[in-house]
């Protein structure tokens, strides 16, 4: 029997034992899973039968208050009403519905997944910045603890697995840094962990893998994110060892990222002036966002201690790192235009219009919508879709142009449906080319600045941008947000999230 038929039987009053609890599970589950009611759970909707809605809500709460305890009435209302979406084409009898029992059909393909907490550390400049001596596993532990602190209803013992992205998983961020960070964060030893790598999209990939595992029924609660210290582990790692066959037959697979940006600029007519203007705007938006406190909700401070010389008695100092240190208030078009090209003598890419090398970490708690409901946690966002695409390594910066349509197709959306896009600014040249070739409205891109100003801690960035995009959706009362980036080696990635506030 199909889920919609089982739901109909429930509504028509076929009864067995354990009525109210199972019925509540069916209402929520079918709202989340049945294609006919695919619209997202928790999203407010207008429903004509307000009296019936209130009656049914009160019946269910009366029978099983523990399952709805702590939820405000609006939240209860939205969850339950979603299950009675009238598109199924029949009238619900609340009295019968509250006393029936059905078995959820196995045809229900996937569950909805929500993000209930998403935070990041402030981003430090690599090599000379505040975090230069802070280990990436420590940064990740701070992010994980910060994410858990936002949802005190969740017992860490419920976490099934931790997935962290890291672009250069060696040295201080080797030895399965996800496991090291989870133990450092104080998670129970029973909580497993894994480190994954898709270069610049590793953090976003981690969130997608956690979400899809929950969708498939393999877990209820996961932690996902990313960490990277470019101060400690340089781009390319400590020992670069190219594959000899590729060096002979496809050397462009190892082309430096800066030169790939130059090829994209040359192909699509991206000028030096446009790159510098884009860079300046990134700094201006980031500085304005910091001044307005827009990043306060998504960031967790990093406590630090260090010892400074003080005569015969070294002095120990403790500080708290709270604010991104990449944005420059002193930058200008004149200053940017005076910089030399960094990768090609006649190129357009400079140190000023490229992403900063950075240190940072981010963590997101991902869980099934059913579990969030049971725990009384109001989700921040719904995971909608994720897609990757391969492209020519020598023009890797164009990767998002090919990943974005795939993510939109999976979500059943159009590009015009996306209200906010966090496009990683690996280089101004490639970001401008992506905006141009993908047909993106520039006004929807990086409203609070991007990696040119705020930094790009490689494996952390996708998770960091996820924390940012869902807060911006909340501020704007907008619905859909996207995180997208190019990926070294010739790829693109894109993830779509829906605001539930």
Predicted regions and their residues:
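N-terminal extracellular/periplasmic Venus flytrap/periplasmic-binding protein-like
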Residues: 120-122, 133, 137-142, 153, ...
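Conserved beta-ketoacyl condensing-enzyme motif
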Residues: 131-244, 254, 299-322, 394-395, ...
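Conserved active-site "lid/cap" helical segment
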Residues: 100, 104-180, 185, 263-272, ...
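Active-site-proximal alpha-helical scaffold in enzymes
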Residues: 196-227, 265-295, 363-370, 435, ...
């Amino acid at each position: 029997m199909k889920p919609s038929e089982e739901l109909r039987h429930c509504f028509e009053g076929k009864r067995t034992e354990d009525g109210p609890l199972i019925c509540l599970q069916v209402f929520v589950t079918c709202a989340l899973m049945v294609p006919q009611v695919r619209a997202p759970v928790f999203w407010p909707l207008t429903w004509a039968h307000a009296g019936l809605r209130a009656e049914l809500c009160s019946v269910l709460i009366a029978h099983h208050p523990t399952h709805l305890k702590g939820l405000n009435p609006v939240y209860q209302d939205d969850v339950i009403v979603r299950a009675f979406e009238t598109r199924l084409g029949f009238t619900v009898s609340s009295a019968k519905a509250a006393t029936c029992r059905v078995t959820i059909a196995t045809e229900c393909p996937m569950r909805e997944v929500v993000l209930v907490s998403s935070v990041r550390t402030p981003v430090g400049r690599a090599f000379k910045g505040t975090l230069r001596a802070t280990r990436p596993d420590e940064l990740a532990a701070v992010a994980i603890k910060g994410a858990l602190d936002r949802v005190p209803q969740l017992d860490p013992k419920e976490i099934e697995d931790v997935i962290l992205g890291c672009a250069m998983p060696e040295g201080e961020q080797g030895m399965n840094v996800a496991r090291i960070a989870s133990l450092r964060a104080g998670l129970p030893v029973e909580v497993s962990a894994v480190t994954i790598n898709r270069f610049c999209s590793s953090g976003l990939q981690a969130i997608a893998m956690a979400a899809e595992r929950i969708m498939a029924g393999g877990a209820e609660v996961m932690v996902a994110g990313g960490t990277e210290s470019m101060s400690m582990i340089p781009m390319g790692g400590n020992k670069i060892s190219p594959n000899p066959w590729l060096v002979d037959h496809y050397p462009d697979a190892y082309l430096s990222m800066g030169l790939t940006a130059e090829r994209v600029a040359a192909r699509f007519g991206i000028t030096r002036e446009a790159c510098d203007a884009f860079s300046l705007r990134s700094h201006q938006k980031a500085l304005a966002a910091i001044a307005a406190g827009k990043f306060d909700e998504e960031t967790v401070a990093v406590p630090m201690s260090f010892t400074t010389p003080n005569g015969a008695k070294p002095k120990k100092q403790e500080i708290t790192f709270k604010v991104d240190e990449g944005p420059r208030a002193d930058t200008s078009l004149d200053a940017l235009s005076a910089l030399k090209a960094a990768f090609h003598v006649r190129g357009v890419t400079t140190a000023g219009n490229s992403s900063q090398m950075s240190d940072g970490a981010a963590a997101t708690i991902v869980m099934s919508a059913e579990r969030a409901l049971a725990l009384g946690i109001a989700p921040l966002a719904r995971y909608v879709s994720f897609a990757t695409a391969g492209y020519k390594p020598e023009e890797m910066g164009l990767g998002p142009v090919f990943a974005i349509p795939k993510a939109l197709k999976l979500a059943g959306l159009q590009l015009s449906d996306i209200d906010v896009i966090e496009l990683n600014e690996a280089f101004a040249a490639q970001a401008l080319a992506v905006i141009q070739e993908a047909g993106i409205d520039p006004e929807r891109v990086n409203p609070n600045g991007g990696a040119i100003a705020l930094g790009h801690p490689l494996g952390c960035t996708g998770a960091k941008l996820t924390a940012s995009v869902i807060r911006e959706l909340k501020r704007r009362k907008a619905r859909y947000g996207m995180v997208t980036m190019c990926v070294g080696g010739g790829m693109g990635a894109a993830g779509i999230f829906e605001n539930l506030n």
